[in-house]
Amino acid sequence: MRGGYQTRTYPLWLRLFLMTAVVLVALFYGFRFATIGTPSLMMLGAPLALVVVLFIWALPPGEYAPSGSLVPLYFAFVAAQALWPNYLAVVLPGLPWLTVNRTLGSLLVLVLLICVSVSKTFRGRMGETLGADPFIWRCLIAYSLLQAASILWSPSGTDSLNDFISGQIMAGAAFFTSIYLFRRAGFAEFWAKTFLIVVAGACLLGLWENELGSVPWAGHTPSFLRIDDPVVMKILAGGARAATGIHRVQSTATTPLSLAELIGLSSAFAIHFVTWRYPLYQRLLAAAYVVMGFHVIILTDSRLGFVAWMVSAIFYLLMWAVVRWREHKGSIFAPAIVFSYPAILIVAFISTFLVGRLRARVWGSGAQQASTDARKIQWEMAMPRIAENPFGYGIGTAGKVLGFKNQAGVGSIDSFYLTLLLDFGILGFALYFGMILRTIWIGGKVVYEYPSHPESRMIIPFVVSLIAYIVVKSVLSQETNGAYIYMMLAACLAIVSTVRSDAKTAKA
């Protein structure tokens, strides 16, 4: 017995069998790599990943989990999502692009697996948080399994495998790390402030880009980060709407639309810090961010960013009024907002048609007509495809299956709804948005039931951002900001668990 392990001698025949099996597998791998080459590198490397997982699983149990390293890695991951261009990467043949985001995500997943493997306390805390609403994590697991299964019927298996692994790393790092960290007191508020700071950094880069006419790093990228890809070249060159010729700011994002989405998703957090009783300097900084963010959205020339701001403001007003009414029973203003809310929605909707500038920002003008028409055509083209195969065509295949090309002759798909339906079918669509809708429901319920709990107030911007996300994804297919959504889902689940746990403790 050494170090908690017991030495065991295996029969000679078993050892010979295992050595022979290893040699045969090595010969097979060598033959496959020699005949197919680097495109098969991802598949050939799968057993190595399995060995790492088995090694982590075999670690002796004990309370020595490296959970302290999760926080710096996590916030580096949060910052990289907004501040590092995801198209600047090291490219090795047969492997996905080695970006900063994927590298940090992989390290997070590795540390997280070690913590889960060795620490019973760590597992217990995560299990308690996930148990706050099992429907959500079950939807997430089912959605991941569906993604994995779709590789089997995908017409381009290698590309789909790359997409699956990259997606699982980003989602796993974002969701499960957040499940653990957001149980800490005050962590949700700290995350929200950090989120606003990093998005503000992306906005400042966007303002700089607007002065230069292209992203600041165009022409100044180190050789080891340069990717010989026409899409990347187009991003670095910058873009403009064909009807106006005016440069559209994109900052670190791959498109102006993704930047506008990111700023729109952050709006509820800025509104939160302006609205509640935070120190004056924080409220002023949040107000300044609102002005800057709105200005950068205008520079992106993206309607979806304005829509996200509008949706966030309207739904935040409702949740704020509910909390005020629940806290101050004698209030007149708060219940007046709640009861008149249907009228507020109707007025807001009608104003998008009657007010000229508002109509242009929401529904577009002549300059955006081509984009509007393209989205209509895509839905018309997609419906027969969805009817032919309601189970989807495989991860990462939606654009090819749809077959739509924009005016420049480039394949395009403009709705994440379509992407889900074409990739994973009706089931995938239901699992993904069912998970988000359920999170919104339990978050709103906690706000209503425990309005005075500081953490339940903090859940409001997370819930509102998820509502805005559902609206925005109807007109944007890219998943550039997907990691933030998984963080928000986990944040809501963790806050719900904390508030309910505190309520039980108070009753006891």
Model feature map: region roles:
Residues A34, G201-W217, T300, L317-G366, ...:
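A membrane-periplasm/extracellular boundary helix in multi-pass inner-membrane enzymes
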Residues L73-V78, L284-F294, G444-V475:
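Loop-to-helix entry and N-terminal half of a specific, functionally important transmembrane alpha helix
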Residues L140-L152, A173, F190-V322, K445:
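Alpha-helical transmembrane segments of multi-pass inner-membrane proteins
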Residues F353-F424, G443-Y450:
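Long extracytoplasmic/lumenal interhelical loops at the membrane interface
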Residues H247, S251-L257, F294-I298, S302-R303, ...:
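A conserved mid-to-late transmembrane alpha helix and its immediate loop/hinge
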Residues Y278, M310, I314, L318, ...:
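Hydrophobic transmembrane alpha-helices and their immediate junctions
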Residues L18-Y29, A65-G172, Y469-V472:
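N-terminal hydrophobic segments of proteins, predominantly signal-anchor/transmembrane helices
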Residues L50-V53, M310-I314, P461-K473, S477-A508:
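Transmembrane alpha-helices of multi-pass inner-membrane enzymes
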